[in-house]
Amino acid sequence: MSFAAHTKKELTMMEGADCCSKAELSALIRMNGSLQFGAGRLVLDVTTENAAIARRIYTLIKRLFQIHAELLVRKKMRLKKNNVYIVRIPNKANEILQDLGIMDQSLSFIPGIAPEIVKKSCCRAAYLRGAFLAGGSVNHPEASSYHLEIFTSYQDFCEALTKIANRYKLNAKCIERKKGYVLYIKEGEKITEFLSLIGAHQALLYFEDVRIVKDMRNSVNRLHNCEIANINKTVNAATRQMENIQLIDQEMGLENLPKRLREVAELRVAHPDINLKELGEMVPSGVVSKSGINHRLRKINEIADKIREKQNISM
């Protein structure tokens, strides 16, 4: 079972006040519901591929409206042959839709999200929970990038959902995607805040544990890469210094260098692997600071560069 599926399973076992259950059910039906006319009346179907979510919808309808809905199971024939679960409400569908803020008394759909359904903070969180159950997904925290999204077919609904999410500073964005619109959250910290908000506390703890280990591992890798880069830089610099000292020795002799440069050149030849600090501590005439050694080696490099320039001119 995927991390997203585990998260949804946890959410379907939550208990809540009637106002919050109504908000959650409103989001579930708003996103996964469809209407049809049968036998002269309005029939509401709520469709999902998740058995736990189907049971959740069935239970909420029964509890809130004292209606026994029908639970149908269909087999998908294309691609993944998963079961499709349909919670069918053959009676009082229009009354339920009006009470949930999805349709008005003239049976016209209410755009976006009805304000009376999400008046309270707890109900806003429950509405986001229902939306996530209906059309949400979240990457496993071990994935290369953090990503949580909720898909909907309607732009106005996506924007309204994003507005609610951002009341909690979740940095949610709404973008158009093929066949619909997506609310998404990219930051690991904001995803944990979203999971906490909708009540997925077990998923949150697991996500945080994995995220902490992952971030520590990434930090260690960055530090290791930085150390390797520094070592390579030091080795390359030492190699260049050795080449320059050998060139000076061949062309003019190290004995003709000023004493302070000759000392450092001879030490570098004798100890090609030590760092500048260690080199400075070995200078015969007295300890020289790291910056002092670096300055003298730059002077040696400049002398070698001038020799090369003369060689190029003579050629």
UniProtKB/Swiss-Prot annotation:
An annotated Gene Ontology molecular function: DNA binding
Family assignment from sequence similarity: Belongs to the WhiA family.
Name recorded for this polypeptide: Probable cell division protein WhiA
Function: Involved in cell division and chromosome segregation.
GO biological process, alphabetically ordered: cell division; regulation of sporulation
NCBIfam families assigned: DNA_bind_WhiA (TIGR00647)
Keyword Cell division: yes
Record's signal peptide: none
Pfam families (alphabetical): HTH_WhiA (PF02650), LAGLIDADG_WhiA (PF14527), WhiA_N (PF10298)
Ranges of the DNA-binding region feature: 275-309
Top-rank taxon, per record: Bacteria
InterPro entries: Homing_endonucl (IPR027434), Sporu_reg_WhiA_N_dom (IPR018478), Sporulation_regulator_WhiA (IPR003802), Sporulation_regulator_WhiA_C (IPR023054), WhiA_LAGLIDADG_dom (IPR039518)
Keywords: Cell cycle, Cell division, DNA-binding
Statement: the UniProt record of this protein carries the keyword DNA-binding: yes
